[in-house]
Amino acid sequence: MKKLALLGALALSVLSLPTFAADKPVRIGIEAAYPPFSLKTPDGQLAGFDVDIGNALCEEMKVQCKWVEQEFDGLIPALKVRKIDAILSSMTITDERKRSVDFTNKYYNTPARFVMKEGASLNDPKADLKGKKAGVLRGSTADRYASAELTPAGVEVVRYNSQQEANMDLVAGRLDAVVADSVNLEDGFLKTDAGKGYAFVGPQLTDAKYFGEGVGIAVRKGDSELAGKFNAAIDALRANGKYKQIQDKYFSFDVYGSN
């Protein structure tokens, strides 16, 4: 019995080993098709607000970091099986996700919005979209909102592996609306040639039940050391001006949101 107990204790200690170590890279998972937060440059390099923030955090923490690309709905499974050590991919902090992973403090917070053709009216999304199609990023907070609120109201919710795919189907006429983070939709769609003739409609979506407490960095359950290092680095970037420097590269407003 003592041997079994010892083996059990050893197994538990292995499972709960912290990720953070100065002599090995921190593997950060990201879905690289969510501009302006994450995207690929023409030469195949990762770029965007999330990438710049992540690189600055790693520099502040004095650790080497390795970006690992993954479809959004595969990020948490990859974290849980230790293919990656953290997720920095515009992932909103929600109670549902906190049952699977731990989060740092937020590093930004923006509302979700609907986009439809210019001139469309959307006073009541559930009533006005009944019998129509709305596109969402699979596994996102918009997906959660749409599943709980739109599907029961008779809206056909169509899920995509990237927001860009949803936007393209809107332009192609296969969708009546898309719903996602407002900044992503503005910079990644409305300000592009493809987004001409489309506009925000309806209310800002901020219900914490669906849209959480802001966007944070996810780590494995119990990895308080890595989460603590990230939190300290976020605070440092906010204090030393580097956060604002990165923010101003992409946005004309305070993307961090109210404290």
From Swiss-Prot:
Gene Ontology BP annotations: amino acid transport
Gene Ontology CC entries for this record: extracellular space; outer membrane-bounded periplasmic space
Keywords, in A-Z order: Amino-acid transport, Periplasm, Signal, Transport
CDD domains registered for this protein in UniProt: PBP2_HisJ_LAO (cd13703)
Domain of life: Bacteria
Induction context: Part of the aot operon that encodes proteins involved in the uptake of arginine and ornithine. Expression of the aot operon is strongly induced by arginine, via the HTH-type transcriptional regulator ArgR.
Signal peptide annotation: 1-21
PROSITE patterns in the record: SBP_BACTERIAL_3
Pfam family, one: SBP_bac_3
Localization in the cell: Periplasm
Gene disruption phenotype: Deletion of the aotJQMOP genes greatly reduces arginine and ornithine uptake. Disruption mutant has a reduced capacity to use arginine and ornithine as sole carbon source for growth.
GO MF term set: amino acid binding
Family: Belongs to the bacterial solute-binding protein 3 family.
Function, in words: Binds L-arginine with high affinity. Shows no measurable affinity for L-ornithine.
Protein's name in the database: L-arginine-binding protein
Gene behind this protein: aotJ
